[in-house]
Amino acid sequence: MRNVIVLIDSGYLGAASCIILSNWGAAWGTWKSGIGLCSMGVNHPGGIIKNLVAIIMAGVLGIYGLIVAIIISGGISKPAYDKNTYSEFTGWAHMAAGLCCGLCNLAAGGATGIAGEYGIKATGHRAELNHAKNNKNMMGNVSSEVGDEGDAARLYIGSVTILSFSGAIGLYGFILSLIITSSDAYECV
């Protein structure tokens, strides 16, 4: 009976680690990106809505963890009268799937948060500089600087590209966890 409890615990530990680590990564990414958004919003409030992408991408990581944790906990079978119905292979597979998804989402949350914070700040700063330069030129002053009006847009596209690749880390863990949990479960003999 003790082996049965240990095996079931490894499955539930996989589900718990998946949801905890994934939401930790989502919270980390939201926190860091939110700092950048608040900082940028002071000087360039017009860019707040389009720069919500980093926060939304960080929140998706928590959803990945929730989905995998539900699948894992649904695959855990209860023991029946001293008979083990949950194999050791399945227990460790559930543990591996939970850790894979959770740790990948934790890493993706950190990458999304850091890239999001600095990308948002840089985009807002560049847009503010372009706006100030346009106002200066409209007042009749000739600027000696030759600037490109598309700098802020190019910087934003680059930032979103970096965020997409950092979010892909979490997606890879999510897909691998789904593959691991969908593998054939061995029945106990």
Predicted regions located by residue number:
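Hydrophobic, small-residue-rich transmembrane alpha-helices and their short perimembrane loops
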Residues: 1-189
